[in-house]
Amino acid sequence: MREILHIQGGQCGNQIGSKFWEVVCDEHGIDPTGRYMGTSDVQLERVNVYYNEASCGRFVPRAVLMDLEPGTMDAVRTGPYGQIFRPDNFVFGQSGAGNNWAKGHYTEGAELIDSVLDVVRKEAENCDCLQGFQVCHSLGGGTGSGMGTLLISKIREEYPDRMMMTFSVFPSPKVSDTVVEPYNATLSVHQLVENADECMVLDNEALYDICFRTLKLTTPSFGDLNHLISATMSGVTCCLRFPGQLNSDLRKLAVNLIPFPRLHFFMVGFAPLTSRGSQQYRSLTVPELTQQMWDSKNMMCAADPRHGRYLTASAMFRGKMSTKEVDEQMINVQNKNSSYFVEWIPNNVKSSVCDIPPRGLSMSSTFVGNSTSIQEMFRRVSEQFTAMFRRKAFLHWYTGEGMDEMEFTEAESNMNDLVSEYQQYQDATADEEADYEEEEAAAE
C-alpha cells in the first residue's frame, strides 16, 4: 500500500541512490542479500513502501537504475548492497552523455528511454496503490539532467495523477565540475518547473560546508555528502514507512508546502548533525533539534533563508517525544522569527511525528522549507548561463545534437520568470490584497 518507486539516473543519482538504499535497508533490518534480519515487527509493517517481497521471502527494492554509461552501474553492483537490486532494473547505454544535456534528452537518452519506461511500468504494475516516484539526479551533467528530465516528462504523461518528487543536486556556486553546468541546469529547471511536483534542492557546496563546519570532517568525500542526503531522504518518507502520531506523505507534503504550483523547489535540512567524536556527549531535546533544524548553516543548498521569507515549511520529527512539545516549539519559532515568514499564510509550518528514530539516534528531525531565498540559486545559475549564452559559447555541442537556440532562450526566460515570482511573493504583504480589491472596485 502507498508504494514509492525510486529512480536514480546518471553518476550522481546512482551514487546518492545507492547510499539511500543502504540507509533504508538498515532501518528496515534488511541485509545485503535481501533477507530480513531485523528484530522488531515495526520494520516489516510497511516495508512494502520501498520493497517488493519476492516468492522466496527476499525483499527487493522498488528501484530503477539508469545511466548512459556502464561505469557507475558496475560500481553500484559491486558495492555493499549491489546484489539486492533486481538485475533487470539496471538499464544502461554504452556511449555516455558527456555532460551534454542534449545527448541525455534528445539523442542518446531518447534511444534508451523506452527500455527504462518498460522497467518503470513493470515496477508500477507490481504496486498495490502507487503513491508516486522519487528521482535522484544532478542537474549539472548530461544523463541525470537531460535523460532524468526526459524520463520525468514521460512518467508525467503516463501517470499524471501520481506524485513526482525529485532530489536534484544543483551546480554549486564555487565548486564546478564542468564548464557547461549552467546550460544543463537551466534546461533542466525549465523541465522541472513544468513536470515535477516537488523538488528537494541540494548542492555540493552547502553539503561540503556542513561536513566541514559542523561534522568537523577535514576532507569530506562524496560518500560523506551522500550520507547527509540519504539521511534527509529517509526522513522525508519515514512517516510512510513507520507508524507515527502525525503522519505525512508525499501528497500531504505537497499540499502543505506549495502555495503556487510553480514554486515547488524546497530547501532541506536535517538535525542533529554532530561530528562523530562528540555524538555521545549530546542529549537530544526537541528545542535543540528545532533550533538546529531552522539554522541556516543546516540547509543543504547554498541559499540563505535569512535573505528571503518562508512561504511554508514542514518539519518531520522522529523518535519518542510529545507532540505537544513539538507544536509548542514550532509555534515558538514562528513567533520569534515572524519577519521571516510571510504573514498572508497563517500557520504555515506543518509538523509530523514518527515514532521510530533512525539508527544510532534517540530522535531526529528533517526540515523541508519553501523559502523565497531559493531564488539566489536560480539567479546565480542564470547569470552564469547568460554570460556564456550571450557569446554563444559551447552552443555547438547542443545544436549539433539537434537542439535549437530558441529552446535556450525559452529556458532562460522561464528561469528568470521563476526568480521574479519568488521575489514578488517575498515582497507581498497581507494588506496589498485589500488595496488591490479596492482598485478593482474603483475600476468597475
Swiss-Prot record:
One of its GO terms (biological process) is microtubule cytoskeleton organization. Mg(2+) binds at E69. Its cofactor is Mg(2+). It is found in: Cytoplasm, Cytoskeleton. Belongs to the tubulin family. Tubulin is the major constituent of microtubules, a cylinder consisting of laterally associated linear protofilaments composed of alpha- and beta-tubulin heterodimers. Microtubules grow by the addition of GTP-tubulin dimers to the microtubule end, where a stabilizing cap forms. Below the cap, tubulin dimers are in GDP-bound state, owing to GTPase activity of alpha-tubulin. This is Tubulin beta-2 chain. It comes from Zea mays.
